């Protein structure tokens, strides 16, 4: 997998967390960089671990599905991408009126981080069928997420109403394109 594809997957995996961070930043009275960085680290670590878990699950099943692994990667990335696009296009439900101080709790951040990283676990399953170093991919996904969450919280006040959903749509489109590229390359023998 090319370095550009690895970076694009890292970016795509961080868009859910970025959208959540914008929402958290928008709910805070005045986000402080230290709190934003702390949230970024929590999200980044979780987002880096989940594709490794998915990769391990995928490797365990590899011998049984090698003949159609490209279809699995395409299906997982495509389905996740379409789901992200759908979530980005659907109208928001009623906004919760939460106490902004609750956005800083470790367990609340960790739970949100895990919820936004489920797609990274599924991508990890797909990566098990490809020639990619999972350690490098996990670090890239974690660093992209750390950066996107930190920036998202700090910009949340300003960007909350403008960017939140678009980030998820862009991430979804990227996943669909990468999935289609994997399928195309396999079917046409492109290395």
Curated annotation (Swiss-Prot):
InterPro entries xrefs: Mntp/YtaF, Put_MntP
Keywords: Cell inner membrane, Cell membrane, Ion transport, Manganese, Membrane, Transmembrane, Transmembrane helix, Transport
Chief localization: membrane
Chain ranges passing through the membrane: 3-23, 37-57, 65-85, 107-129, 144-164, 169-189
Subcellular localization, as worded in the UniProt entry: Cell inner membrane
GO cellular component, one term: plasma membrane
Residue stretches in coiled coil: none
Membrane topology listed for this record: Multi-pass membrane protein
Example GO molecular function: manganese ion transmembrane transporter activity
HAMAP family given in the database record: MntP_pump
Family stated for the protein in its record: Belongs to the MntP (TC 9.B.29) family.
Task of the protein: Probably functions as a manganese efflux pump.
PANTHER family: MANGANESE EFFLUX PUMP MNTP-RELATED
Protein name: Putative manganese efflux pump MntP
Species of the source: Stenotrophomonas maltophilia (strain R551-3)
Taxonomic lineage of the native organism: Bacteria, Pseudomonadati, Pseudomonadota, Gammaproteobacteria, Lysobacterales
